[in-house]
Amino acid sequence: MFAVVFFILSLMTCQPGVTAQEKVNQRVRRAATPAAVTCQLSNWSEWTDCFPCQDKKYRHRSLLQPNKFGGTICSGDIWDQASCSSSTTCVRQAQCGQDFQCKETGRCLKRHLVCNGDQDCLDGSDEDDCEDVRAIDEDCSQYEPIPGSQKAALGYNILTQEDAQSVYDASYYGGQCETVYNGEWRELRYDSTCERLYYGDDEKYFRKPYNFLKYHFEALADTGISSEFYDNANDLLSKVKKDKSDSFGVTIGIGPAGSPLLVGVGVSHSQDTSFLNELNKYNEKKFIFTRIFTKVQTAHFKMRKDDIMLDEGMLQSLMELPDQYNYGMYAKFINDYGTHYITSGSMGGIYEYILVIDKAKMESLGITSRDITTCFGGSLGIQYEDKINVGGGLSGDHCKKFGGGKTERARKAMAVEDIISRVRGGSSGWSGGLAQNRSTITYRSWGRSLKYNPVVIDFEMQPIHEVLRHTSLGPLEAKRQNLRRALDQYLMEFNACRCGPCFNNGVPILEGTSCRCQCRLGSLGAACEQTQTEGAKADGSWSCWSSWSVCRAGIQERRRECDNPAPQNGGASCPGRKVQTQAC
């Protein structure tokens, strides 16, 4: 087979019209492509009992083997549900004694919260049939909730890096009327109907929900626009991954920048999948990349540590979990409410765009990537952190001539093949506009809209089972231990360590139930096994953790090996520990 390939390539070199890409391919050192691996799912589990509060039953199947190296993909989902009827009464929380119990979910409330004007039950039953409403001392109906409170209340899936359903109840106030002062309320507004200027008194104070211990508005300020330059897509991906890991304080399942990238696993695809697919189009060509990035903070917050009031939907799902371990039911709970919950963080927004630059064309124009970056970023009207100045072959006048790269024709004239934008936070109108129109007005308008439409941009978090320690629901230790055990199993089932090996410093990526290797420039093939550079250093990558050993003397351990693949030609060994222990 190899002789035939070599003969064909030899004939091609003697023919006219051979492309540059074909010449590159001729210099590629061929290696055996690993055999394709077909995706395998387990058989469906038995249906769960009918959930009486939902009138639904569930079943699941496990990912036995993700497909690799072009193998057949799996079809269908790993979760299934069906309607059902249960003869069992809807499960309630333990009896509330002298306290009030919400009709639908069984939440317990202190009597002073009944008929106080606040709806503390999701079904409003605490405010039904009230002859005398004991209103809170101060009229709180005039205050809007603090911006972003619903976002901070959500669970978080550390594998998909996506939000899950609510863990905290962001609409519960505990009978209190605590407000947060907004220092920028004095900003003048214009009422076009009445043709008058006025102060935004309605935005002077915001009401703080019970589960928020602290919330402090920040004067609108960005971190400055930074620019970074990359010679290949892999280095850029590693940096983006590291930034995402740095945004949260617990990194279970993520690992250092050199470990496998986790994207879109379980039942959904990460929002980053489209970004990776766009970037992957430029991986095998001679492109370089400039990443322009800014982060805007609008507020800091800290959540309550003890006596947490859970969202009523989560409370109901929690009460329906059996005390006996059932991975399917507990994994479904994790899939719905996240692997982790947020304990503190910052609100605001993030804006970044990546310039894909044709290196050969840029050099023929006599300009640099810094010149191009300055020309594009200057349209935002913000200073760069590294004080880039327009220079080289691209003068300020030349930049203006092409309109700052605002049209496709102008971009092509400055060697910019594509622009990949990502915007988080802000009103939908301004964030969408910023992705398409990089102007000073659009950027500043987006920044102002972040004050009242922020997302969580930096945060600390804890594993989801820890929240059960900090509620007032009573003894839940059996469920907490089951949830902890299921979380370990869930994180291993959907980990990119199951992909690979990806050779020549390729990066394994797990998308849904499919694995692929992101190859560096100069490498290609399903496993990046073909390379143009003979004897180049290739770093090692970890295998998955083994199962936990039997408990001995209160300690158990698990291991992993640096063989997925092993280092080659003097490449670096895997970072981190080979053995992990825990109390048992």
Swiss-Prot record:
Per the record, where is site Not glycosylated? N43
Ranges of residues in domain MACPF = 135-498
User: Which cell locations does it reside in?
Assistant: Secreted; Target cell membrane
Signal peptide from the UniProt entry:
1-20
A GO molecular function assigned to this protein is: protein-containing complex binding
Keyword Transferase set for record: no
List residues of the LDL-receptor class A domain. 94-132
The UniProt entry, under PROSITE patterns, shows: EGF_1, LDLRA_1, LDLRA_2, MACPF_1, MACPF_2, TSP1
TSP type-1 domain spans which residues?
Answer: 38-91, 539-583
InterPro entries documented for this protein: C8A_B_C6_EGF-like, Growth_fac_rcpt_cys_sf, LDL_receptor-like_sf, LDLR_class-A_CS, LDrepeatLR_classA_rpt, MAC_perforin, MACPF, MACPF_CS
The record places propeptide residues at 21-30
Q: Which UniProt keywords apply?
A: Cleavage on pair of basic residues, Complement alternate pathway, Complement pathway, Cytolysis, Disease variant, Disulfide bond, EGF-like domain, Glycoprotein, Immunity, Innate immunity, Membrane, Membrane attack complex, Repeat, Secreted, Signal, Target cell membrane, Target membrane, Transmembrane, Transmembrane beta strand
User: Per UniProt, what is the membrane topology?
Assistant: Multi-pass membrane protein
UniProt record, GO biological process: complement activation; complement activation, alternative pathway; complement activation, classical pathway; immune response; killing of cells of another organism; positive regulation of immune response
Free-text activity regulation comment from the record: Membrane attack complex (MAC) assembly is inhibited by CD59, thereby protecting self-cells from damage during complement activation. CD59 acts by binding to the beta-haipins of C8 (C8A and C8B), forming an intermolecular beta-sheet that prevents incorporation of the multiple copies of C9 required for complete formation of the osmolytic pore. MAC assembly is also inhibited by clusterin (CLU) chaperones that inhibit polymerization of C9.
Q: Where does this protein hold Ca(2+)?
A: L113, N116, D118, D120, D126, E127
Q: Which cysteines are joined by disulfide bonds?
A: C39-C74, C50-C84, C53-C90, C96-C108, C102-C121, C115-C130, C140-C177, C375-C399, C497-C544, C499-C515, C502-C517, C519-C528, C551-C584, C562-C574
Q: Which residues cross the membrane?
A: 248-256, 259-266, 377-384, 390-395
Q: What SMART domains does the database record attribute to this sequence?
A: LDLa, MACPF, TSP1
> What residue spans carry the region label Disordered?
562-584
Q: Which disease is it linked to?
A: Complement component 8 deficiency, 1: A rare defect of the complement classical pathway associated with susceptibility to severe recurrent infections, predominantly by Neisseria gonorrhoeae or Neisseria meningitidis.
UniProt lists the family membership as follows: Belongs to the complement C6/C7/C8/C9 family.
Subunit structure, interactors included: Heterotrimer of 3 chains: alpha (C8A), beta (C8B) and gamma (C8G); the alpha and gamma chains are disulfide bonded. Component of the membrane attack complex (MAC), composed of complement C5b, C6, C7, C8A, C8B, C8G and multiple copies of the pore-forming subunit C9.
- Record-given protein name: Complement component C8 alpha chain
Organism per entry: Homo sapiens
